[in-house]
Amino acid sequence: MAETLCRMFQESVKKFADYPAMLRKVDGSFRPITYREMGDRVRGLTTALLSIGVTRGDRVALMSENRPEWAISDFAILHAGAVNVGIFPTLPVAHVEYIISDSGARCLIVSDQEQLAKALAVREKFGDLCIISMNAPRDGAESVLSYEALLRDGEASPLADHKYEECWSSVRPEDWASIIYTSGTTAEPRGAILSHQNFVSNYSTARKVLTFQQGDTLLSFVPLNHVFGRMVDHYLPISLGSTIAYVENLRRLRQNIQEVRPHYMAVVPRLLEMFEEGLKAAFTKEPRVRQKLIAWAFSSGRAMVEVQAGGSVGPLLTRKRWLADRLVFRRLRDRLGLDRLRFFFAGGAPVSRDTLEFFSAMGLPIMEGYGLSETSPLVSVNPPGRIRLGTVGRPFEGVEVKLADDGEILVRGPNVMQGYYKRAEETKEAIEPDGWLHTGDIGTIEDGYLSITDRKKNLIVLANGKKVLPQHLETLLLGSPFIFQAVLVGDRQNTVGALIVPAFDRVREWARAHGVEGHVGDETGFIEEPAVRRLIRMEIQRLTEGLADYEKIRAFALVDREFTLEAGELTPTLKIKRRVVLERYGHLIDSLYSDSSESN
């Protein structure tokens, strides 16, 4: 087994030289870049980085969307003995400035003009920051180095081979590979230090469980600056000789899926929910006879999923599921470009039970896993053929998991980070002397399968001392086709409340069908319609019927727009930033408890 990411890459370049490593969209079609070509580009860029003064241990920041240059830049940084500091391209200038300052990065590689503008703004405060632009620098961008020019110079350097070999071969397993800054849903980002050994241990154990293989094609969508995307869409497939196609952008995602026809996809739950919502909306436009056939097919598929979870499947149900696949699901998968897909690999947040069953019924199983930036990232996954819905699977080989007395999940293994960068005290709080990492997540373990119930910091403690786990309830609420987003509130209050973002398109369809025409085109007025509020109230009551009395949502407020990435309310993996939302909508939360009749 390779001991460093550099050695893993070199072995893959040699073993899979003429196979496609990456696919990128050029002139309307996806074109391949072979492992040999990728290796040549990594060698050229590594040599160029060394020539401009990058040395072992330097931090080099990388702010780019998913694209081949990101992958090449990452391996070049590592081969130079430097440390990759990933920065999400969606972050505003202030956040970029914070990460550059905190990490001490001496160089910043950016993708396009938008990222370059942020880099130049940051450099006004850090005058010695070296900037490399993947796209041609704009006029007037002085002292900005061209990625392509550096690459050409590096490849042409007569010392390239000697310097390159000497540098990457001296990288050690314990050397830092990356500083991963957490998304910060509850606090300011902290940099988790991950070594080559951390990453190598993680992909080495993951490939024993996940059925990835040479020749597979995946579509890279989860941000590569996120540790989940970094592992599942980058290191793991490269180690196996798979092919990585890069999504153009979110708007073209469905088109790209149809073009690439991936064998597997790493996804975040929100993407699956968007797919599900789109498909269900499309089903309503089918002729009535076809709608009945689709409903029967999903009923048969869900029945199969439920029986499989509990034991053996009888011949009658097997026959029904086969017929449903032939009449409905096979055509549907073909139309979506998912005919070759073996599974979705979901991480970052829990997937609702309804969504899990929906895709599993279609013959598209979702393998939920669990991990953190601090664990490189994978801790557990549902093994193929032994998926237990609603859990995040079993721990990987060599990774230990146990629960503290308060239910917090503790993890120990070779994947656990080296610590938080420049935060010795926080590192001591997070990692026990015997190596156990406090994850901050609360969970349960049954038959070796781990389930996540919530973040410890998100726990709502009511005035009577009762404790409520908001994530579980929020996931329940998302089971309604009329609820798009939900945030539970009620800390130190007598009852639980909720901020609800309606699924406006679906609610409008319902309103028109029920003769509710007022304010249909105006979100602010629309959410005040008594009929709309009654609909949401009934959905909340239906979905939370089985909860304990103290957990039930007694008051809610409707929000007139969705929480977005652009407004700073979502993380780059589309999780709601609870702290931001609670601060921004404090007036609505106050109204829940000052005048509950108004909110209900």
Predicted regions and their residues:
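Conserved pre-ATP/AMP-binding loop-to-beta segment of ANL
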Residues: 17-20, 155-181, 188, 211-217
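Conserved AMP-binding/adenylate-forming core of the ANL superfamily
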Residues: 21-75, 92-97, 146-152, 196-197
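ANL superfamily adenylate-forming
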Residues: 27, 114-173, 279-331
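Conserved AMP-binding A3 loop
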Residues: 32-36, 168, 177-203
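Conserved structural elements of the adenylate-forming
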Residues: 39-44, 173, 192-213, 330
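Structural core segment of the AMP-binding/adenylate-forming
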Residues: 51-52, 79-152, 535
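Conserved AMP-binding/adenylation subdomain of ANL enzymes
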Residues: 200-217, 224-329, 340
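Conserved ATP-binding/catalytic segment of the ANL
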Residues: 395-462
